[in-house]
Amino acid sequence: MSSTPAVASATPSHGALPAYDTPLGITNPPIDELLARTSSKYALVIYAAKRARQINDYYNQLGDGILEYVGPLVEPGLQEKPLSIALREIHSDLLEHTEGE
């Protein structure tokens, strides 16, 4: 008997459908690649949350004809959340970030 623990696989060995869909959102882009762009996980959270707030405010102001905030810098997917858009912008190096701002 092997001492190696069993690992669930998304690709079944017997030709059936996978047990789950490929995860999207916070795992895409990968968290390790996002962390490489900031000094800490806490800085990443604040950075992404501030940008997501700007994107959300942009969508809210569109109906009023005010253009105070910058919209998404990447093509947003259908029904994509502002935080996911912000994380993709960070991953694509489309934003400049200064620690402490």
UniProtKB/Swiss-Prot annotation:
The gene name on file is rpoZ
Domain of life, per lineage: Bacteria
Q: Where in the sequence does UniProt note compositional bias of the Low complexity kind?
A: 1-13
Purpose? Promotes RNA polymerase assembly. Latches the N- and C-terminal regions of the beta' subunit thereby facilitating its interaction with the beta and alpha subunits.
Q: Where is this region: Disordered?
A: 1-22
**Does the keyword field hold Transmembrane helix?**
no
Name a single GO biological process.
Answer: DNA-templated transcription
Give the record's subunit note. The RNAP catalytic core consists of 2 alpha, 1 beta, 1 beta' and 1 omega subunit. When a sigma factor is associated with the core the holoenzyme is formed, which can initiate transcription.
Keywords associated with the record: DNA-directed RNA polymerase, Nucleotidyltransferase, Transcription, Transferase
* EC number, UniProt record: 2.7.7.6
The record's SUPFAM superfamilies line, in alphabetical order, gives: RPB6/omega subunit-like
- Entry similarity comment: Belongs to the RNA polymerase subunit omega family.
Can you name a GO cellular component term?
DNA-directed RNA polymerase complex
> Mind telling me what this protein is named?
DNA-directed RNA polymerase subunit omega
**Catalytic activity annotated for this protein?**
RNA(n) + a ribonucleoside 5'-triphosphate = RNA(n+1) + diphosphate
**Which InterPro entries does this entry report, sorted A to Z?**
DNA-dir_RNA_pol_omega, Pol_omega/Rpo6/RPB6, RPB6/omega-like_sf
Q: Which Gene3D superfamilies match?
A: 3.90.940.10
One GO MF term attached to the UniProt entry? DNA binding
Q: Which SMART domains match?
A: RNA_pol_Rpb6
Species of the source:
Rhodococcus opacus (strain B4)
